[in-house]
Each structure stands twice: as structure tokens, then as C-alpha cells.
């Protein structure tokens, strides 16, 4: 009973000395705002098709049928200029030429731009595309939003899956595509990209650390007018430009 009576007095004394009760410090959000409210975009499996156009200046890598007479191809100029591979939205013409509708930002020295597609099932929402970049290993994924005959770049998923492979008598680290482990949510131009599995490799945590291994559930990217990296439930601010 004495302890129960003394405790309120002690609290009152602390309040009196401090000039009033202290305001509680708001906790950092554990997830980006309204993360759970964003609808899920489902993976859309599109087979790679044979080339259906002839183009004098483009070397076609892969072709996909998006429906309604529109196709997407990953292609590069056959003079191998520095901009490298891109995604092209087009309609095939009767003479086998391509009527180009839109194109993505270039992949520069990447030798691959293998796309993975996500959809809400409503064509009006467009498609979210993540395109794997790399040469022999994955460098990460460029995220695009294909909507209204345009291909908008959202940002870069700077992550890959790390695997260990034994060749002859030596074991090597390989970085492979994160696409099979990527989940997409989005609505009205806001998108979130999260990852499944045990762990992933983050190439740059924007805090001075490179090639960091992290639990996959702790890494998230968000697009809401700007591209954001969230780690362990907190927004990471990139260092100021020097």
C-alpha cells in the first residue's frame, strides 16, 4: 500500500519540476502510409513470341502481345549505340513494319531487359512492368508504368537475389533476378514494390553501405511522385549532393 501511495506523489513531483507533462514522441511509422490500402497487382504471364515486324534499324530481342493490336518488344539499334536496349510499344503494320507508339528510357550497357508484367485486370489502369537489367548477372530492375500509350519510368529496384553456385572445385556468388519474388501494389499513380523470400542483396542503401544483405521483408520501394526507398519501415533520405 505504501508503494502504491508514493508512486503518484513521485509522478507529480516529476511533472512539477519539468514545468508540465511532456508531450509523447510520435513513433516512426512501421510501414509506408496507406500501404495496406493499396490494391494488389497480379503477375501477368505473357509468353515470348517470334518477331512479327521487320525494322531497318532495330535488333529485336523479345516480343510480347499486349492485346488490342498492341505489342511490346525489347530491342536495340543495330548500330549498338551507347543507349542500348529499350522497351518499345508498337502496332504491326500490314507491310511488316512497326508503328512505334512509345518507348522507354534506355538500358545503356545492359544486355538484357527481360520484362515482368503486373495488372489489376482493368486495362484502364495500364500495366506495371519491371525489367531485369544486367549482363551475365542481375543488376536490378527498372520499374515502368505503361498507360495511355506511354511508358513512364518510376525508378530502379536496386536489389537482386544472391545465390551460391559451384563450378568445378570453386564456389561463386551469383546475383539473379528479383522479379519472381516481387509483389506490386498501386492505385492512382502510387505504387509499392515489396519482396518475398528470406533475404536479398541491396546494392546501395543510400547511407554509405554497398551490397548489403538484408531480410527481404525489410526492403520496400514506393513511388508517389518521387521514388523512395524504405528500410525497416523507415523512409531513407539520400545524402545531399556534394
Where are the language model's segments positioned?
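Sec-dependent signal peptide recognition
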Residues: 2-9
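C-terminal motif of bacterial Sec signal peptides marking the signal peptidase cleavage site
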Residues: 14-16
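Acidic, small-residue rich beta-repeat scaffolds with periodic aromatic anchors
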Residues: 18-56, 143-159, 164-242
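Terminal domain-start segments
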Residues: 20-113
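Structural signature of eukaryotic scaffold interfaces centered on beta-propeller domains
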Residues: 53-68, 114-124, 175-187
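Short beta-strand elements that form the blades of beta-propeller/WD-repeat-like
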Residues: 69-78, 123-135, 186-196
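Short, solvent-exposed loop/turn segments at conserved positions within beta-propeller repeat blades
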Residues: 78-85, 135-139, 211-215
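Extracellular-facing segments of soluble proteins and assemblies that are Gly/Ser/Thr-biased and enriched
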Residues: 111-146
Amino acid at each position: 500500500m505504501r508503494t502504491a501511495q508514493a508512486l503518484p506523489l513521485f509522478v507529480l513531483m516529476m511533472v512539477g519540476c519539468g514545468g508540465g507533462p511532456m508531450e509523447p514522441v510520435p513513433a516512426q511509422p512501421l510501414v509506408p502510409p496507406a500501404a495496406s490500402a493499396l490494391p494488389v497487382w497480379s503477375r501477368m504471364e505473357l509468353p515470348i513470341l517470334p518477331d512479327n515486324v521487320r525494322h531497318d534499324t532495330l535488333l529485336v530481342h523479345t516480343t510480347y502481345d499486349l492485346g488490342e493490336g498492341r505489342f511490346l518488344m525489347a530491342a536495340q539499334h543495330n548500330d549498338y549505340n551507347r543507349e542500348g536496349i529499350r522497351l518499345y510499344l508498337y502496332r504491326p503494320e500490314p507491310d511488316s513494319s512497326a508503328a512505334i507508339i512509345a518507348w522507354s528510357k534506355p538500358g545503356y550497357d545492359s544486355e538484357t531487359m527481360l520484362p515482368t508484367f503486373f495488372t489489376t485486370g482493368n486495362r484502364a489502369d495500364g500495366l506495371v512492368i519491371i525489367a531485369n537489367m544486367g549482363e551475365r548477372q542481375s543488376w536490378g530492375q527498372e520499374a515502368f508504368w505503361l498507360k495511355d500509350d506511354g511508358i513512364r519510368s518510376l525508378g530502379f529496384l536496386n536489389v537482386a537475389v544472391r545465390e551460391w553456385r559451384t563450378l568445378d572445385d570453386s564456389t561463386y556468388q551469383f546475383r539473379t533476378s528479383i522479379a519472381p519474388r516481387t509483389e506490386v501494389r498501386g492505385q492512382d499513380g502510387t505504387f509499392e514494390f515489396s519482396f518475398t523470400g528470406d533475404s536479398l542483396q541491396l546494392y546501395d542503401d543510400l547511407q554509405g553501405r554497398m551490397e548489403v544483405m538484408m531480410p527481404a521483408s525489410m526492403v520496400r520501394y514506393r513511388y508517389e511522385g518521387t521514388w523512395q526507398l524504405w528500410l525497416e519501415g523507415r523512409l531513407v533520405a539520400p545524402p545531399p549532393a556534394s
